[in-house]
């Protein structure tokens, strides 16, 4: 697979008077040219006896020396299995110490780690394994409550399938992680060092399947250079040091858990704690307290669950100061709770996407609370960003449009999918490569970015653009609403009208009427933004569960399809 190459040309800066939405990130600190293997060796030299990785649910407490040694033994074993530069190694597992070892082991020998989402069905996992042609797959018989038996059976039935290695637990006739480690212990590392010398920072090291809200997942090709530098800059924005302890509930199969979590900590010599195999409220709260964490990451739904739970006896979070909340739009009340309940006065908002390795914008810890509540911060070092209209023209500052990203951090393309790569990665007239994110955003005059929705989620009602996020935020401000999902529904007259799927708050004494909610929206927003159709989750033929991508984003196209179907069946719903 030939990666897309990027030019280092600096996009042409427009005249000052134009005030166009074009930004360039700081040029300091400089980019570094390190492989992930070199990064771990360097940090081990500096912080060898310092704890790096804590997994309360397995009891593991690995120092930098431990992680480096385990990954080196495993890398040696992979070489003995014939795995080399460019070969694909798959992993489907929960958060555990072995996951980190597999990641660095593959990186050390130039292999490409194919990360498989734990929420995949056996069919989806098989697609990822076969599409990327994995030679080895690391997994477990169970991941949380999920049983992997069917997937293992499907792999066994392949004529020329990958070698399956069990990370832990019952192994039956499969090779195990411990077997591979033991096979390499005591052997000379010369073979490994020779392999490491053949690895370049600009080689692909990771395939991340994007959990897009439409179509089959695509595999973003990320390089050592992408990940090492992006994780450095993330940690810098959080002011991480070797004294920090990060509690990281997000999964390692996602960039949030891997890059914003593990790698941001490793680049700064700190310690990371993965509380449980899969997200567990009680385990996360215990980890924050027991490990004296200074930071905690999470998507909004995770933090919401933590704040709704009863804190354990003697719970302490007096050292908590920072962390990142990202992955989905963040309600204001949730950010306020980070400060009020956790004391995270230095929390940071963030924006990124898999194809950009991932973080593009991140707030500083000393940005005002209001700035962190309303924006995703400013552009990261060595990145470029612009906002364009539907014709590809850069819009003035303050005008919404599609966010595009350029710079060192862009993916090398989608694995074996040149058509999709060409669709989202487009060179401008000066030859600069831009990634079209599909996200709608706006810049202010100081370079702060606000994400206002999905560019393709815009509802066009009678020729007027309507932005779902502002309607969702208004509906969520109603005391009887705990969840709001706004989509465009088909209309013969307007083309599209506003539809809203709502969840009633547990504390609500009664369900508000449709008219009450329409009036509620109209008080702050225009009448054309008031929902024409209202549906309640779990009622009137509407499922209680919302379809989500693997990273927790709502599949809005499925919700819109459901709404259209309900209307076609003439389900009794109030109409405007």
UniProtKB/Swiss-Prot annotation:
Gene3D superfamilies: 3.30.300.30, N-terminal domain of ligase-like (3.40.50.12780). Disruption phenotype: Leads to increased sensitivity to oxidative stress and iron-starvation, reduced conidial germination as well as reduced virulence. Impairs the production of the 6 siderophores beauverichelin A, dimerumic acid (DA), Na-dimethyl coprogen (NADC), fusarinine A, fusarinine C (FsC), rhodotorulic acid (RA) and tenellin; but increases the production of mevalonolactone and eleutherazine B. ATP binds at residues 439, 454, 553. InterPro entries: AMP-bd_C, AMP-bd_C_sf, AMP-binding_CS, AMP-dep_synth/lig_dom, ANL_N_sf. It comes from the Eukaryota. One of its GO terms (biological process) is fatty acid metabolic process. Transmembrane segments: none annotated. The keyword Nucleotide-binding applies. One of its GO terms (molecular function) is ATP binding. A motif (PTS2-type peroxisomal targeting signal) lies at residues 3-11. Acyl-CoA ligase; part of the gene cluster that mediates the biosynthesis of at least 11 siderophores, including beauverichelin A, dimerumic acid (DA), Na-dimethyl coprogen (NADC), eleutherazine B, ferricrocin (FC), fusarinine A, fusarinine C (FsC), metachelin A, mevalonolactone, rhodotorulic acid (RA) and tenellin. This cocktail of siderophores for iron metabolism is essential for virulence, and more specifically for the fungal virulence in penetrating through the host cuticle. Siderophore synthesis is also involved in conidial germination under iron-deficient conditions. This is Acyl-CoA ligase sidI. It comes from Beauveria bassiana (strain ARSEF 2860) (White muscardine disease fungus). The lineage of its organism: Eukaryota, Fungi, Dikarya, Ascomycota, Pezizomycotina. The gene is SIDI.
């Amino acid at each position: 697979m030939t990666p897309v190459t990027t030019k280092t040309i600096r996009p042409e800066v427009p005249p000052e008077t134009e005030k166009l939405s074009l930004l360039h990130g700081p040029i300091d600190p400089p980019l570094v040219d390190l492989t992930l293997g070199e990064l771990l060796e360097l940090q081990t030299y500096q912080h060898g006896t310092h704890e790096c990785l804590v997994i309360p649910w397995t009891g593991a407490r690995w120092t930098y020396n431990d992680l480096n040694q385990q990954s080196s033994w495993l890398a040696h074993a992979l070489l003995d299995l014939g795995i080399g530069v460019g070969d694909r190694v798959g992993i489907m597992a929960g958060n555990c110490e072995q996951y980190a070892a597999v990641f660095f082991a593959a990186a050390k020998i130039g292999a490409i780690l194919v990360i498989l989402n734990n929420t995949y069905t056996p069919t989806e996992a098989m697609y990822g394994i076969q599409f990327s042609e994995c030679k080895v797959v690391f997994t477990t018989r169970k991941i949380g409550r999920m049983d992997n038996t069917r997937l293992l059976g499907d792999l066994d039935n392949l004529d020329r399938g990958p070698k399956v290695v069990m990370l832990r637990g019952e192994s039956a006739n499969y090779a195990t992680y411990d077997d591979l480690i033991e096979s390499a212990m005591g052997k000379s590392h010369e073979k490994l060092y020779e392999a490491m010398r053949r690895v370049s920072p600009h080689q692909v090291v990771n395939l991340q399947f994007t959990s897009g809200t439409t179509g089959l997942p695509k595999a973003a090709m990320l390089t050592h250079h992408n990940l090492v530098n992006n994780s450095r800059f993330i940690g810098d924005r959080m002011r991480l040091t070797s004294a920090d302890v990060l509690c990281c509930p997000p999964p390692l199969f996602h960039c949030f858990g891997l890059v914003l979590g593990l790698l941001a900590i490793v680049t700064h010599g700190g310690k990371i704690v993965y509380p449980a195999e899969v997200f567990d409220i009680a385990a996360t709260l215990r980890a924050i307290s027991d490990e004296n964490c200074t930071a905690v990451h999470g998507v909004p739904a995770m933090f919401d669950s933590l704040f709704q739970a009863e804190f354990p006896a003697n719970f302490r979070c007096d050292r908590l100061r920072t962390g990142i909340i990202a992955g989905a739009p963040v309600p204001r009340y949730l950010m306020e709770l980070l400060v009020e309940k956790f004391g995270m006065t230095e929390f940071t908002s963030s924006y990124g996407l898999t194809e950009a390795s991932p973080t593009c914008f991140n707030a500083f810890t000393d940005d005002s609370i209001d700035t962190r509540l309303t924006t995703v911060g400013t552009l990261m070092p060595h990145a470029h960003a612009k906002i364009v209209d539907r014709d590809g023209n850069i819009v003035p500052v303050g005008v919404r449009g599609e966010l595009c990203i350029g710079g060192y951090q862009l993916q090398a393309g989608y694995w074996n999918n040149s058509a999709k790569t060409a669709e989202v990665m487009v060179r401008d007239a000066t030859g600069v490569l831009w990634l079209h994110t599909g996200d709608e955003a706006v810049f202010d005059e100081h370079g702060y970015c606000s994400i206002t929705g999905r560019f393709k989620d815009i509802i066009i009602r009678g020729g007027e653009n309507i932005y779902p996020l502002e309607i969702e935020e208004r509906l969520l401000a109603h005391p009887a609403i705990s969840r709001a999902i706004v989509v465009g529904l088909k209309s013969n007259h307007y083309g599209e009208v506003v539809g809203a799927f709502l969840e009633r708050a547990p504390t609500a004494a009664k369900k508000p009427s449709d008219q009450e909610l329409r009036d509620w929206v109209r008080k702050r927003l225009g009448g054309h933004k008031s929902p024409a159709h209202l549906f309640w989750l779990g009622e009137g033929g509407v499922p209680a569960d919302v379809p989500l991508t693997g990273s927790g984003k709502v599949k809005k196209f499925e919700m819109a399809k459901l709404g259209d179907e309900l209307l076609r069946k003439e389900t009794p719903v109030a109409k405007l």
